[in-house]
Amino acid sequence: MLEGFQILVQNTVQGTIHKIKCVCDSQMSVSEMSCSESTSACQSLEDGSVPEILISLLYNATNGRLSAEVIKGSHLKNWAANRPPNTYVKLTLRKSTDQEMSKCKISIRRGRPNPVYKETFVFKVTLFQLSHVTLMLSVYNKSSMRRKMIGWIYLGLNSSGEELNHWTEMKESKGRQVRRWQALLESR
């Protein structure tokens, strides 16, 4: 059972830090996170036909923090118009019972098929809970009238294939960031 959790959002593009407290007892600063920047170059998985998202995962077992950095998107399309999309990403953390624990949203990146997000979300999740949660990332195109989902992925309990490999490697990495391109499951 999750006692409480806290989310820190750092927008590294604009240099601002936002704290969102959700059913929590304590505050934490970004300086308390032990994130190490990966020096390896990451290349997109696909040739341009599939929308993708570059995600970095980190779990710190010492303080029970799950960090998910949404770095950038690639080949995101605007199905409704012949212009680049205005995109944002929504992260939803769910228990094994499919009960929503938390949701957060990245600010909109306007007119970019390959947007750079560089926003980090930190969730408090104990080590024994880590195998029983799912992180869903949904990418949306926002127009003046409505929003349309471009695609989504699951990481964690309800994932498979490359998404499950990413999650498993993060759990076994002993506090090291694990970056991967993930192909979005398209929603038309």
From Swiss-Prot:
Keywords for this protein: Differentiation
Induction remarks: Up-regulated during neutrophil differentiation.
GO molecular function term, any single one: phospholipid binding
Tissue: Expressed in mature peripheral blood neutrophils (at protein level). Expressed in heart, pancreas, liver and skeletal muscle. Expressed in umbilical vein endothelial cells and melanocytes.
Pfam families, A to Z: C2 (PF00168)
Domain called C2: residue spans: 49-182
GO biological process: cell differentiation; positive regulation of CREB transcription factor activity; positive regulation of dendrite extension; positive regulation of ERK1 and ERK2 cascade
UniProt name for this protein: Putative synaptotagmin-14-like protein
Species of provenance: Homo sapiens (Human)
Lineage: Eukaryota, Metazoa, Chordata, Craniata, Vertebrata
Chain's gene name: SYT14P1
